[in-house]
């Protein structure tokens, strides 16, 4: 039977709409970069010496903490030993959780012991059920702790969620509890760090955007992904023609250190965006590459920064290998020079809990070095 002519366009339109809907649905699921799908290395059985450390008490109080730069001038470049100790003490349970989740997830992805998975999930569900870190009472240091903790946990969780070993297949209730909590925290982080004046947007905002990007992929929320990309673009447009970040240059003797500290979240966001078909490398004429090149040059010759802001640079932090974990995503986005690759290989593996653990395992697994550095990173 011949289809009436009037109906043909309708059927064609339906077919087109159907194919568009399928394509949209197929591309809608957010994913991390390729290495996050790595399987568990070896499912170990039998005797073991793993024991899950006590879960720190969920932090449900107001997020008001002293700054380690308390009493410093606007440069925020001079540490206050007394207030730093008070800060470390007040935030100990939060950082213990961050480090614990990262470490145990790394151990589980290596050994595959059920006890390790139980431990990691129990840490996160315990805090989730307590509505930890959700306080609307906070100061700058407090909201900073919230976004750091979220980024640490959600990026470690990605290793579990996307592994081709599917460790969460039989833990869907735990996954739901954790992801619902991450989602709530991300909404608050977006609120905490939105609509700041440009002079107030610095590495803290970049780290906030990273925590939201990791959570976007963990919870498959496009709105969070879009916010992180938007914040990245603001950051990229702060990079000047010479590769400097004016707001980080204000940090005087710590300017180079803070330029380096700005790179991990930005490189990770760009890498995650790339995995989802969004190429951020051209933003502001290749700002990320310009920033990375400037920092690498500055590490070799700190006088570049000293000449720019008149301060001899404090290189203490830059002697710690995990501070260069950004080289993993960076060298996946760009073709790094042989000397940069050599330096990267010397410093590997890069394990830093604020980026979810072992980035070498994700980005450059052929240069992984077992459990070396499991307790390192910041």
Swiss-Prot record:
Recorded hits in CDD domains, A to Z, give: AlgLyase (cd00244)
Q: Where in the cell is it found?
A: Periplasm
InterPro entries in the record: Alginate_lyase, Alginate_lyase_dom, Chondroitin_lyas
Note whether Signal occurs among the keywords. yes
Q: What class of enzyme is it?
A: lyase
Hey, what's the signal peptide range on this chain?
1-28
Regulation of activity is described as: The monovalent cation sodium enhances activity but is not absolutely required.
Q: Does the keyword Signal apply?
A: yes
Positions binding substrate in this chain are: 67-68, 140-141, 258
Q: Thermal effects on activity, per the entry? A: Optimum temperature is 42 degrees Celsius.
Stated EC number for the protein is 4.2.2.3
pH-dependence annotation: Optimum pH is 7.0.
Q: Name one Pfam family in it.
A: Alginate_lyase
Mutation: residue 204 to A; reported impact is: Loss of activity
**Function recorded in the entry:** Catalyzes the depolymerization of alginate by cleaving the beta-1,4 glycosidic bond between two adjacent sugar residues via a beta-elimination mechanism. Degrades deacetylated polymannuronate (polyM) alginate from P.aeruginosa more efficiently than non-deacetylated polyM and alginate from M.pyrifera. AlgL from P.syringae also degrades its own alginate, which may indicate a role in cleaving preformed alginate and/or in determining the length of the alginate polymer. May serve to degrade mislocalized alginate that is trapped in the periplasmic space.
- Family membership noted in the UniProt record: Belongs to the polysaccharide lyase 5 family.
Q: What's this protein's name?
A: Alginate lyase
